[in-house]
Amino acid sequence: MITIVGSGRVGATTAAFLMFYELDNEVTLIDVIKGLPQGEALDLNHAAAILGKSVRYKGSNDYKDMEGSDIVIVTAGLARKPGMTREELAGKNAEIISSIADQIKKYAPNSIVIITTNPLDAMVYVLYKRLGFPRNRVIGFSGVLDSNRMAYYASQIIGIAPESIIPVVLGQHGENMYPVPEASFVYGKPLTEFLTQEQYNDIVKKTIQAGADITNLRGFSSNWGPAAGLALMVDSIKKNRRRVFEASVYLDGEYGVKDVFAEVPVVLGKNGVEKIIELNLTPEQRQKFMQSIEAVKKNLTQVPPQYLK
């Protein structure tokens, strides 16, 4: 069974995308708001009936209904509101994630957990510490979205399909992410060979600003892109496809970094993170990567210390 904790835009849209992959007969949506997950589940069941899909949705306000889940997706959390500091957001979401982690540990102790809650690299660290699961079973959703945004923007300039580009984005999921066009390829040729310096700079800027651009345009954050990426990750895990994704994972010496979650390429299969792929970065690339890691560490300082143990 797949459980989605949080029935807002990202959670509900992810549930809809999972319908088309038909990875499990049952998807459970859990939320603290009474009626919300039940309503989403009912609507999704109607859609599944129309499309002839076998998946059945259940909505609940009781965490016990995640019992036996092999994958849990956590989309719950507060969005940053006007006047709210980053420290306040980190503190409130850390409290929420810690509470959810306790329920996952109780009812789905063998699950693989993927989280989208922001600030991502800090919240996945909180989740990992609270769960006490092996690091391969705790994953932050980040790079799938960031790297494919970069591929999209590059494809618009080059004039090829985005899936023909192998993009690389490293480090923090946020304004200090490090897009690496020099390490991104189009059938063996570096992406930078197809771009002028001005185009290169523009792609990097657009990739970093993409989330904010969506929010500024429509008044709320992205849900379609994250949901599509989450469904693809779950597909690779459930079907043991061992596809390469970028995700925020716990580094324990990889890339010269320890005790931090950061965005790097990984192989996802039936055990969660099957392998962390270490790229051969140039000294300049490594310096930029480490600058991004410092931003991740700074985010952690905004989390109340009781949630980091």
Curated annotation (Swiss-Prot):
The entry sums up its family as follows: Belongs to the LDH/MDH superfamily.
User: What organism, scientifically named, is this protein from?
Assistant: Caldivirga maquilingensis (strain ATCC 700844 / DSM 13496 / JCM 10307 / IC-167)
Q: What is the uppermost EC class here?
A: oxidoreductase
Reaction(s) the record says it catalyses: (S)-malate + NAD(+) = oxaloacetate + NADH + H(+)
Q: Which PANTHER family match?
A: L-2-HYDROXYCARBOXYLATE DEHYDROGENASE (NAD(P)(+)) (PTHR43128), L-LACTATE DEHYDROGENASE (PTHR43128:SF16)
**What role does it play?**
Catalyzes the reversible oxidation of malate to oxaloacetate.
Query: Which keywords does the record carry?
Result: NAD, Oxidoreductase, Tricarboxylic acid cycle
Q: Name one GO molecular function term.
A: L-lactate dehydrogenase activity
Instruction: Tell me a GO biological process for this protein.
Output: lactate metabolic process
Report what the protein is called: Malate dehydrogenase
Instruction: Please tell me where NAD(+) binds in this chain.
Output: G6, S7, G8, R9, V10, G11, D31, N93, T116, T117, N118
Keyword DNA-binding recorded: no
SUPFAM superfamilies tied to this protein:
LDH C-terminal domain-like (SSF56327), NAD(P)-binding Rossmann-fold domains (SSF51735)
Q: What is its EC number?
A: 1.1.1.37
Active site located where?
H173
- Pfam families from the entry? Ldh_1_C, Ldh_1_N
Which amino acids does the record list as binding substrate? R80, R86, N118, R149
Q: Does the keyword Oxidoreductase apply?
A: yes
